Amino acid sequence: MEGIEWNRQNLAYQSLTEVPPELIERDGFKTAELDLTHNKISDLRFLVDYPHLTTLILDHNLVGSHVKMPSMNKLHTLWLNHNKITNLSTFVATLVKSCPNLRHLSMMNNEAAPSFFNGGTFQQYMDYRYFVISRLQKLDALDDKIIQENERAEAERIYGRSKPRKKKKKVEQDNNNT
């Protein structure tokens, strides 16, 4: 949007459980980057008031697998390292729905993102990568690594391509009314 000076809102290390409403009201609309590192955030519904967010940093928070997120079509970078994400398929389904244009995702040191550093095997790490790559097809980087074309091909071979869910047709409802 022309004429708006986009800003970066840094609320790191504040022990916040939520973003103060006065800050959302003052800065939400014009914030492109939001850093909430090292807080106690678990609910992301407040992000509805950040419609132009492109980068969100939530490292070291309490974000879980079943987190509620608004639609964030402009978000391209999301860091969620050191959170409480335990169910990969549930969490990734939320990302597919809420963040369709995500290009950079980092989930290191979550139970759902196995790696050598948190006790996972190399095979578990690769399975995690392939699954995420298969579902978030616009992703360019996952954790600390650029996604290679051979990884995309293997992800598609193993998990297939993620297809958008079709909405139920109104036919079922119409049949009930007759």
Briefly describe each language-model feature range.
Residues 1-42, 48, 52-57, 70, ...:
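Long, contiguous C-terminal flanking segments immediately downstream of a protein's structured core
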